[in-house]
Swiss-Prot record:
GO terms for biological process: defense response to fungus; defense response to Gram-negative bacterium; DNA damage checkpoint signaling; negative regulation of apoptotic process; negative regulation of cell migration; negative regulation of DNA damage response, signal transduction by p53 class mediator; negative regulation of engulfment of apoptotic cell; response to ionizing radiation. It comes from Caenorhabditis elegans. It holds the Pfam family SH3_1. This is Tyrosine-protein kinase abl-1. GO terms for molecular function: ATP binding; non-membrane spanning protein tyrosine kinase activity; protein tyrosine kinase activity. Interacts (via SH2 and SH3 domains) with mig-13; the interaction is direct. May interact with soem-1. The active site is at 432 (proton acceptor).
Length: 1224
């Protein structure tokens, strides 16, 4: 309970168990004239065997005769049942006369006596705290064994549950305490939704004021004691009808029709008006007036109850949705206390007291201590000890930093870990651990408070129910995705709390919207270490943020590590050393940035031609060894030294101005190479390029003009901006022509045009390379070779994996043809030291920049204020989101490694193991300008090593999440080990405009994707790209949903047909294993170019998804037509002789049952489109229909009992009511 924190919770799970009114089989009759005799009969009947026989355990032969849903008319009534009851309080009091008042003197109920114990029904959901209390759902039936001394609690045995699933069946027979006012006798009218008991005429009109025509309720008459009144709303007015009783104890409104029970009367008038102004259609929901007061514990009811006259309220400390927190004075003990007051009608009392019920069992020096409660009258209080410094969040923000050195911060964190370790050992979860919910007392003593969301775990995990809400930025991924919580979920929240403490109260994930947090976490991003944070503390944060709960430490281990850190006495020295490094790097980086700014300003005085050059400069504005200022929350060298001990580079992470984004964890640090290496090497090329002032520059794409101007900080003059734009537009046509003329479509490709916001590709170059190699001009075009390489890489990535290795002109430029420098492939171009690539990635993981999250196309927000950011970030925004890209290992170690033949042989061996790794996806917005051209077939291998890296690293992030994997939808799971890198990409990419745009050209491009076999020169194309996922033009694979794959399989036909065609096209296969894999797994199929007709036409993705399930919306006409079909089948079925069991009859039974099931599912969808009142009745009818359908379906068994005529009538009656409701 935070003094300055909101006392209200996001939501309380106790409200999530909302369910429909229970189904009861027993009717209710009117009261006798004498109250005493009526109560005596009621108690006797509640113990009678007749009532005890009617339960969910009742045989179908008894339950099958219900003609309609039981909310209005419980069947199976007889003359012995009574019509009504007095108030529930009288019933409880009378029922308790035979019980033992003192709990200590209560007798043990034997099996024989428990069978005669009174049967009660739960009116509301009750969630017991601890093992002594019995949790109930609304509608559950219990037998009362006894009461405590003040009758506030009763000990009950669970007799039956509303749901007869396996988990509930195991609970039958459990014994525990429940509040007396949460249950009512089985024959009580309180179980009906429409019965409101003793309410006034004006109250009934107020309740029906929010209803519609047909809304009604039944109440006790104010003027005629012992009789009832129906209040019904029609055309904006409320009409009241008294229910009369004749000499034979029958109830009626008009003399024409009379009834023995109130339930029968209400049901009749729900079908026929018969004197009422309209039908009784929509029962008005009643307030939970019965959920009144009860003591905190059944065994010690007065232990925590305090006299509110002893408490003097002082100033208000904080407030929230559900109540306020005050500073108070306790006169008896002469001490200051904190009082948490519940606002009237803000939340149910039992939910408010659940927090106190948990706190009373917790006693630890680092947990806020409960002193008592005041629950006898409103407002209700929870009283705890007073913490003078308020909550931890505000304390960190307002306190002078000099008073909170690092050693004090770590001590605070250690105290919190100690308290959480105590909760962990006692199987409690907090679920709302944050700085705002921790309180600070004198001498920096910290205690955990606010247990409103805390729960006791009977198993290893606790699952919150649908609709529960929690603080997103503090909740673990399994809690956000599946509402599953454990102590390891609190460990995740502790990592965020530790980050709050280290930043003196800053909000986590700065600049990230709540809707984007889960996407960042799922794709490996984590927050950077705070500035000056010691590596050991940041390491602990990252351990708490492991994706798999099993990989996170326990609180006792966290507490042990923090205590060791405190005792080491080296914490302050580490912090000072870290800050000194950061300051030195910042000074050096500022100096370099100022030089770049001066060059940029000097260029602004040149012509529009030079403006375009300067726009290119924004893509390559760093020198070979940049030192970027280490701003807040930037991962520094020491921050990640425990991840990569072999790191020797001194380059820090790149960050633009504005709030940073979380970096990936240690398994996912490789993507950061893309920007750091590009920034470090492209600067030399950019500077040389400026001095050469070549005329053949890339034109400004129309859609990137504003981005380019914004990136330069608005320094481009307006006139020059317009001239540059117009000049670029004039050059677009000629530039396109030169692009199309190039054999590979990459000779004149534009980086600014080819790479969109969602591009995942760049060309990282190692620092050790001589930058002069990349600034020489190509003899054919006179253009900068380095720029041509980048364009070529980005261009050819969209065509085929074979083109990944074509840009070796820097190593052996003479091998390129004069006509098309990048057009042909040859064996000399395969010069990649594969085995050194991982080492390079590992050695550069610390110097790489933090990946910038992609735009909203990938469901991650992008900083709007990145003016000083290099344009190279535009080309790498998705880096790190989907795992390391294969650009990491491309052309990295060309100069370092000279053993090309060995590398080539090693590469071929590697290819044979990795040739089925799926392509990756790069959403490029300008794919429409990229033609597909023929490629040389002389090469025997395919460069797919980067795919292996991507799949491997992505698997590291998610392969240990076994508790969560089965919850994931198909589109988020890996189809096999080699395709784990495609996890969750389709979910983000579905909303991407860029992805949708590039998908238009997939049909044209996919059949032309060449792929070479490692064991021959036969040129084949994959015919099952629809299985691995739709291949984007850039060469990546998108994971498909299950219904997409199913529809594609249907179009493909059987596996044997496809395999036979492939065998005809490729008659000679060298490896039997491949042939076996071809027939076994569709994802491994390969065919020749002649098999293009096997590939089905690509549908529009939106149509494909929506059309597969919701081809047409559920309409009233659809339901009516289905009803007519079932009606006809029903008539035909029962026209057959009942004794005749033929195959025809059996088949008709199954067909009709299936159609009824189809009707049930269709109506369930239709029910969501109608008014809430109609939905209530609709669902009741559907539930009844399902029961009848089940009974009829199994009645076709020759050994089964033949269908009774009453069941037929009941089914027909229920069926007719559904038809009337649909028509109405």
């Amino acid at each position: 309970m935070g003094h300055s924190h909101s006392t209200g919770k996001e939501i309380n799970d106790n409200e999530l168990f909302t369910c429909e009114d229970p189904v009861f089989d027993q009717p209710v009759a009117s009261p006798k004239s004498e109250i005493s005799s009526k109560l005596a009969e009621e108690i006797e009947r509640s113990k009678s065997p007749l009532i005890l026989e009617v339960s969910p355990r009742t045989p179908d032969s008894v339950q099958m005769f219900r003609p309609t849903f039981d909310t209005f008319r419980p069947p199976n009534s007889d003359s012995s049942t009574f019509r009504g009851s007095q108030s529930r309080e009288d019933l409880v009091a009378c029922s308790s006369m035979n019980s033992v008042n003192n709990v200590h003197d209560m007798n043990t109920v034997s099996s024989s006596s428990s069978s005669s114990a009174p049967l009660f029904v739960a009116l509301y959901d009750f969630h017991g705290v601890g093992e002594e209390q019995l949790s109930l759902r609304k509608g559950d039936q219990v037998r009362i064994l006894g009461y405590n001394k003040n009758n506030e609690w009763c000990e009950a045995r669970l007799y039956s549950t509303r749901k007869n699933d396996a988990s509930n069946q195991r609970r039958l027979g459990e014994i525990g305490w429940v509040p007396s006012n949460f249950i009512a006798p089985y024959n009580s009218l309180d179980k009906y939704t429409w019965y409101h008991g003793k309410i006034s005429r004006s109250d009934s009109e107020a309740i029906l004021g929010s209803g519609i025509t047909g809304s009604f309720l039944v109440r006790e008459s104010e003027t005629s004691i012992g009789q009832y009144t129906i209040s019904v709303r029609h055309d904006g007015r409320v009409f009241h009808y008294r229910i009369n009783v004749d000499n034979t104890e029958k109830m009626f409104i008009t003399q024409e029709v009379k009834f023995r029970t109130l339930g029968e009367l209400v049901h009749h008038h729900s079908v026929h008006a018969d004197g009422l102004i309209c039908l009784l259609m929509y029962p008005a929901s009643k307030k939970d007036k019965g959920r009144g007061l009860f003591s905190l514990s059944p065994n010690a009811p007065d232990e925590w109850e305090l006299d509110r006259s002893e408490i003097i309220m002082h100033n208000k400390l904080g407030g929230g949705q559900y109540g306020d927190v005050y500073e108070g004075y306790w006169k008896r003990h002469d001490c200051t206390i904190a009082v948490k007051a519940l606002k009237e009608d803000a939340m149910p009392l039992h939910e408010f007291l659940a927090e106190a019920a948990i706190m009373k069992d917790l006693h630890h020096k680092n947990l806020v201590r409960l002193l008592g409660v005041c629950t006898h009258e409103a407002p209700f209080y929870i009283i705890t000890e007073f913490m003078c410094n308020g909550n931890l969040l505000e304390y960190l923000r307002r306190t002078d930093k000099s008073l909170l050195p690092p050693i004090i911060l770590v001590q605070m964190a250690s105290q919190i870990a100690s308290g959480m370790s105590y909760l962990e050992a006692r199987h409690f979860i907090h679920r709302d651990l944050a700085a705002r919910n921790c309180l600070v007392s004198e001498h920096n003593i910290v205690k955990i408070a606010d247990f409103g969301l805390a729960r006791f775990m009977k198993e290893d995990t606790y699952t919150a129910h649908a609709g529960a809400k929690f603080p997103i930025k503090w909740t673990a991924p399994e809690g956000l995705a599946f509402n599953t919580f454990s102590s390891k979920s609190d460990v995740w929240a502790f990592g965020v709390l530790l980050w709050e403490i280290a930043t003196y109260g800053m909000a986590p994930y700065p600049g990230v919207e709540l809707s984007n947090v889960y996407g960042l976490l799922e794709n490996g991003f984590r927050m950077d270490g705070p500035q000056g944070c010691p590596p050991s503390v940041y390491r602990l944060m990252l351990q708490c943020w492991n994706w798999s709960p099993s990989d996170r430490p326990r609180f006792r281990d966290i507490h042990f590590n923090l205590e060791n850190l405190i005792s080491s006495n080296s914490l302050n020295d580490e912090v000072q050393k870290q800050l000194k490094k950061n300051n030195d790097k910042k000074l050096e980086s500022d100096k370099r940035r100022s030089n770049v700014r001066e060059r940029s300003d000097s260029k602004s005085r040149h012509s529009s031609h030079h403006d375009r050059d300067r726009d290119r400069e924004s893509l390559h504005s760093r020198n070979s060894n940049p030192e970027i200022p280490n701003r807040s929350f930037i991962r520094t060298d020491d921050s990640v030294s425990f991840f990569n001990p072999s790191t020797t580079s001194k380059v820090t992470s790149f960050r633009a101005q504005g709030p940073p984004f979380p970096p990936p964890p240690q398994q996912n640090t490789k993507p950061k190479l893309l920007k750091s290496v590009l920034n470090s090497n492209a600067r030399h090329a950019s500077e040389e390029f400026e001095r050469n002032e070549q005329d053949d520059v890339v034109p400004l794409a129309e859609k990137n003009v504003r981005k380019a101007v914004t990136r330069l900080g608005g320094t481009m003059p307006k006139g020059q901006r317009i001239d540059a734009y117009l000049d670029s537009m004039r050059r677009v046509d000629s530039w396109k022509e030169s692009t199309d003329a190039d054999n590979e479509g990459a000779g004149s490709s534009s980086l600014s045009r080819t790479v969109s916001n969602d591009s995942l590709d760049t060309l990282p170059l190692p620092d050790s390379m001589n930058s002069s190699t990349y600034v020489k001009m190509h003899p054919a075009s006179g253009e900068n070779v380095f720029l041509r390489q980048i364009r070529s890489k980005l261009k050819k990535r969209s065509e085929t994996p074979e083109l990944d290795h074509i840009d070796s002109d820097t190593a052996d430029e003479t091998t390129k043809s004069e006509k098309s420098p990048f057009g042909s492939l040859n064996k000399s171009s395969i010069k990649y030291p594969i085995k050194n690539a991982p080492e390079f990635s590992e050695n550069h993981s610390r110097v790489s920049p933090v990946p910038v999250p992609p735009s909203r196309n990938a469901s991650v927000s992008v900083r709007p204020d990145s003016k000083a950011e290099d344009s190279s970030d535009e080309t790498t925004k998705d880096v790190g989101m989907w795992g390391p890209k294969h650009a990491v290992t491309r052309k990295i170690e060309i100069v370092k490694n000279d053993s090309y033949p060995n590398v080539e042989g090693e590469l071929k061996a590697k290819i044979r193991n990795l040739r089925h790794v799926p392509k990756e996806e790069s959403n490029t917005s300008s794919q429409e300008d990229l033609p597909l051209d023929a490629t040389d077939n002389t090469n025997d291998s395919i460069i797919v090593i980067p795919r292996d890296e991507k799949a491997k690293v992505r698997q590291l992030v998610t392969q240990k999440v076994s508790p969560l994997q089965h919850h994931r939808p198909f589109s988020l799971q890996c189809p096999n080990n080699s395709t784990s890198s495609a996890i969750s990409h389709s979910e983000h990419a579905d909303s991407s405009e860029t992805s949708s745009l590039s998908g238009v050209y997939e049909e044209r491009m996919k059949p032309e994707l060449p792929r070479k076999r490692s064991n021959g020169d036969t040129k084949v194309v994959p015919v099952t790209w629809i299985i691995n996922g739709e291949k984007e033009p850039n060469g990546m694979a998108r994971t498909k949903s299950l219904r997409d794959i199913t529809s594609k399989f249907e179009q493909l036909g059987t596996a044997s047909t496809i395999e036979s065609k492939i065998e005809e096209a490729v008659p000679y296969r060298e490896h039997a294993l491949e042939k076996k894999g071809t027939s076994k797994r569709f994802s491994m199929l390969e065919g020749s170019n002649e098999l293009k007709h096997v590939v089905p036409p690509r549908k529009n993705r939106n149509q494909d998804e929506s059309g597969s399930i919701d081809e047409e919306p559920v309409s009233k006409d659809m339901i009516v037509s289905l009803l007519k079909v079932i009606q006809k089948e029903f008539v035909n079925l029962f026209n057959l002789a009942s004794s005749e069991i033929t195959d025809e009859k059996l088949q008709q039974f199954v067909i009709m049952a299936d159609n009824v099931q189809k009707l049930h599912s269709t109506c369930s969808v239709y029910a969501e489109q109608i008014s809430p009142h109609s939905k209530f009745r609709f669902k009741e009818l559907l539930s009844q229909l399902e029961i009848y359908n089940r009974q009829i379906k199994f009645s076709h068994n020759p050994r089964a009992k033949p269908v009774d005529d009453k069941l037929k009538m009941a089914f027909q009656d229920c069926f007719d009511q559904i038809m009337r409701l649909v028509d109405r």
